[in-house]
Regions:
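Interdomain hinge/linker at the junction between the two RecA-like core domains of SF2 helicases
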Residues: 412-466
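C-terminal helicase lobe and adjacent C-terminal extensions/tails of nucleic-acid helicase motors
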Residues: 399, 459-460, 466-468, 479, ...
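Conserved Walker A/P-loop ATP-binding site and its immediately adjacent core
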Residues: 277, 282-284, 290-314, 415, ...
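Accessory nucleic-acid engagement/destabilization modules that flank
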Residues: 2-9, 14-223
């Protein structure tokens, strides 16, 4: 008898594991017409466990054995040596081999003109040589054992013929769609394998999928929205024109939600209550098209809790899963988070695209749950330029091949069709009269936008707010924001000026936002100086404000925090800083777009931020005028050309984290937690566990560090390490823990010695 796993309640026969994995893979693959293909790779994925070496692994006698390669070897050997191929499509064969081979690690290989040479069986004296791919030895002892394994596979009928009904026909000229399909199939295998293993360990049958109930949830959403309308009516604000416009946006979302599966866009100004309107559209889509779930993708970590909480108020905590890097899950919920198994998922763009464009098994486990779903992107213009084309092509594949609707929500109408490779991209607009909506919004908001003559100084900016008690001022960089904050602080004292940037840990940011909201509500003096972390989803309403020249979408987002409800005349300034501020922009693309905004302000004699022709002129100039902004990086283009899933994932990063340092900081409101962790790490020789990484997320600060700032951090922090085992060697990490309390300021967060070398992304 050969076993797949062992446990305190006994071993699991290999046949049992293969059949349960097959059953689950069929269930997952059915959502995108791939039950047959997913069943095949599930039956073969652990064929290498029917070997003496792997049984020794279970007995604790051997380690560093690769069992996954055996199933791929066998499938490839059968493909080239049988008179009748199990499939006539070589890329389907390459996909199946890659999925089986990488189900515990990663999906690798080219899917166009694939090279299968490394899947040829080794010579008889080479079976025990470590594999080039991972340094492990194959589970097979020799050719004789391979023959035994092959005979077992034939007896069990692990290979079956694949027909056109077992997988969809993916356009051969669309490598982005082909790579996405490969990841989807891989995801089904990984999830089925891990879920089957968990079922054996817990001795429980796998749970049924947690899917959406559209009628019930629409009723709850309408009840929740009506309760908000009653509160607004009781406050005497129901007749405000902005609330009437919000009702129109919501109505349009509801009507268009009753459409077919497709790629849609919602173009509506900032402040028109899109959070609930997006959910109305998604639920109507789920009802019409029988979707299983809704996935809401948000651009910034700072706003995900706010949106998730609003949905929880409407639907209840059990319906909404908040999946981001700061959320701690109890063990009974963690499996649902790993799998995205919930009716409503609220996640960040980093998490979402880590799955959509990655190749690692664990993040990809959840990916197949994108099939038969509605995916909603809030503020889609935040897509990085060097990734935009391939990202949109992958997203276009969702409605075409996976029965998934995609909705882009935006306040700035990005015309992606101006990019050289997206000329034919035309999503369906769900707002009935976009131009009329913006014209109404411009009239009712009653906010004067003034483009100031550059260059400005802190003093000249501050002069614009003399006689004003409340204002928001936003800069491109931490250095500039700090300078303005200290200037106002010197003028007013610290009681009425606040600061937000990436130098603050997440708990500190939330506390600042709570303080600012309270002061605004009580009409107390309040000035907030911030970087762009304020721009999306933070529900603040200042009577006046200012924004340093930035990409047009960023300027519009900041303007959306000024006179949000149109209750009083507002004033909003746009300015450029003097040349003494050497580093005015985070990167070259940000600089180019900021300069386009400044150019258009000069060209148009100001900035009418609700003028669609201005937005159109902006994107036309950005995509036509900037070669980098008009196409993806050359490395990504090459990876797409060959459908090279590994090369693609290596280049596909929403955030460039190669110079990122994570610092655990002594934020005073959570000082007990910090002191406890610091003591633990000292006892552990500063080796941090994954559990400690997760538990400290509220007091972490991520910094993109230059050489000088790294020297500063090393003087004031302890470097952290991780061990390969309890007594293994220490492996360096890009993590630190603060050593001295004064490195974290109660007002401005993690200090920086060389502020000119650091900037916010």
């Amino acid at each position: 008898m050969f076993y797949a796993h062992t446990s305190t309640h006994g071993p699991e026969p290999l046949e049992d594991h293969l059949r349960l994995t097959e059953r689950l893979a069929i269930r997952y693959g059915e959502t995108f017409q791939s039950a047959g293909l997913c069943a095949l790779i599930a039956r073969l994925h652990d064929l290498g466990k029917r070997t003496e070496k792997f049984q020794n692994v279970l007995a604790g006698k051997e380690n560093h054995i690769d069992h996954a390669i055996v199933g791929a070897w066998y499938l490839n050997d059968e493909y080239f040596n049988c008179a009748k191929h199990y499939t006539d499509d070589v890329w389907i064969h390459a996909l199946c081999c890659a999925a089986i081979r990488g189900h515990h690690s990663e999906l690798c290989g080219r899917l166009i003109s694939p090279s299968l040479d490394d899947l040829c069986l080794p010579d008889d004296d080479e079976y025990d040589i470590p594999l080039n791919s991972n340094g492990k030895r194959s589970a097979l002892r020799d050719e004789a054992e391979y023959d035994e394994v092959a005979a077992y596979a034939q007896t069990q009928k692990l290979i079956s013929q694949l027909s056109n009904e077992d997988y969809p026909t993916i356009d051969r000229t669309n490598p982005e769609a082909r790579m996405l399909y490969a990841r989807m199939a891989f995801s089904c295998l990984v999830d089925a394998d891990y879920t089957a293993t968990a079922s054996f360990s817990s001795q429980k049958e796998p749970d049924a999928e947690r899917v959406i109930c559209p009628d019930e949830m629409l009723t709850k959403l309408h009840q929740y929205r009506n309760s908000i309308i009653r509160i607004v009516a009781d406050s005497g604000k129901a007749e405000l024109p902005i609330n009437q416009l919000r009702n129109e946006v919501y109505r349009d979302a509801s009507i268009r939600g009753n459409g077919p599966v497709g790629f849609y866009t919602m173009t509506a100004p900032t402040g028109t209550a899109k959070t609930l309107a997006l959910m109305e559209f998604a639920l109507q889509q789920a009802k019409r098209n029988h979707f299983d779930r809704i996935i809401v993708v948000l651009p910034y970590l700072s706003i995900i809790s706010q949106n998730a909480e609003e949905y929880r108020k409407a639907f209840g905590a059990d319906t909404v899963l908040e999946d981001d890097s700061n959320t701690e899950f109890p063990e009974e919920v963690k499996l649902y988070a790993d799998r995205w198994d919930a009716p409503v998922i609220v996640t960040t763009s980093v998490k979402f695209f880590e799955a959509l464009g990655g190749n690692m098994a664990v993040p990809l486990r959840k990916l197949h749950h994108l099939a038969n779903a509605c995916v909603v992107f809030d503020e889609c213009q935040t897509l990085p330029h060097q990734l935009t084309t391939c990202t949109i092509k992958m997203l276009q594949a969702l409605p075409e091949y996976f029965h998934t609707t995609v909705l882009f929500s935006t306040a700035t109408l990005p015309v992606y069709a101006y990019r050289r490779t997206l000329e034919h991209f035309q999503p369906v607009e769900i707002i009935e009269n976009v131009k009329g909506t913006y014209q109404k919004y411009d009239q009712l908001k009653d906010t004067t936008v003034i483009a100031l003559d550059s260059p400005m100084t802190y003093e000249s900016i501050w002069e614009k707010f003399i006689g004003v008690d409340q204002a928001l001022i936003v800069f491109n960089t931490v250095n500039a924001a700090l300078g303005m904050y200290h200037y106002i602080q010197d003028s007013l004292g610290s009681g009425s000026v606040f600061y937000l940037s990436s130098d603050l840990c997440s708990e500190h940011k939330q506390e600042i936002i709570r303080l600012v909201k309270r002061k605004l509500k009580n009409q107390e003096q309040c000035f907030l100086v911030s970087t762009q972390c304020i721009e999306a989803g933070v529900d603040l309403d200042f009577p006046s404000g200012a924004r340093e020249y930035a990409p047009l979408s960023s300027v519009i987002q900041t303007a959306g925090r000024i006179n949000r409800n149109g209750e009083h005349p507002g004033t909003f300034y746009v300015f450029g800083l003097g040349e003494r501020n050497e580093r005015r922009y985070p990167d070259i693309t940000y600089q180019n777009e900021s300069q386009v905004t400044e150019f258009l302000a000069s060209e148009y004699g100001g900035l009418s931020l609700n003028d669609l022709s201005l937005m159109d002129a902006y994107y036309k100039r950005v995509y036509y005028g900037d070669r980098e902004a008009g196409q993806d990086s050359l490395e990504l283009q090459k990876a797409c050309k060959y459908a090279d899933v590994q090369a693609f994932s290596e280049q596909y990063h929403i955030i460039d984290d190669k110079n990122q340092i994570i610092v655990i900081v002594p934020y005073e409101q959570l000082s007990t937690e910090f002191d406890h962790l610091s003591a633990e790490l000292q006892e552990q020789d500063y080796c941090i566990s994954k559990a400690q990484m997760r538990s400290s997320k509220k007091i972490q600060v991520s910094r993109y560090a230059s050489r000088k700032s790294m020297e500063f951090l090393r003087r004031h922090c302890h470097a952290l390490f991780m061990r390969t085992s309890k007594y293994g060697e220490r492996i360096p990490l890009n993590w630190m823990i603060a050593d001295m309390d004064n490195i974290y300021n109660p007002q401005t967060g993690l200090q920086r010695e060389e502020s000119t070398d650091s900037f916010v992304f």
